[in-house]
Amino acid sequence: VQGKGNVEIELDGDNELKSGFNRAGLEKTDFTFIGTPSTGMLTLKDDNQKAGSLKATGGQFGAGIGGAENGNGKDITIKGGTVTATGGEFAAGIGGGFGGSGENITINGGTVTADGNDWAAGIGGGKEREGENITITGGTVNAAGGIGGGTGGNGKNITITGGTVTAKGGV
């Protein structure tokens, strides 16, 4: 997902995205250092008329949902459905790829499982990068690798006001 527009994806039925080398499973990357930053919002939702799920797996160095290698995964909202996001090597489940931060991530519904891989956050930054402005207001969230920055990166402005959240740090 690139460009300046907003993208809203309605989850109906079971969906699976698996990426190749250096890419995210569902990519919403901001490469500010090599071109125009992406300014749109990616929203995943399920209107509950048809049960919806998404399983997104990043390729080597790519987030499950968010940034490719060296890409920031930002401006991502999950409003519902069952979402499972697994990062590739050194990448977040939801947020930054290896070398990328995770910013402005909101979860306000659904069941979300986010697995960071090898020193990355479950939700937030890839290895050695920050995770910031992460908000959880509802739903059930399980984050392996924790919530915030990857190993060597800072986590800041993490707000949890509702839902059921389990966050476990990892290596």
Segments (PLM) and residue ranges:
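A composition-driven surface/loop motif
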Residues: 1-171
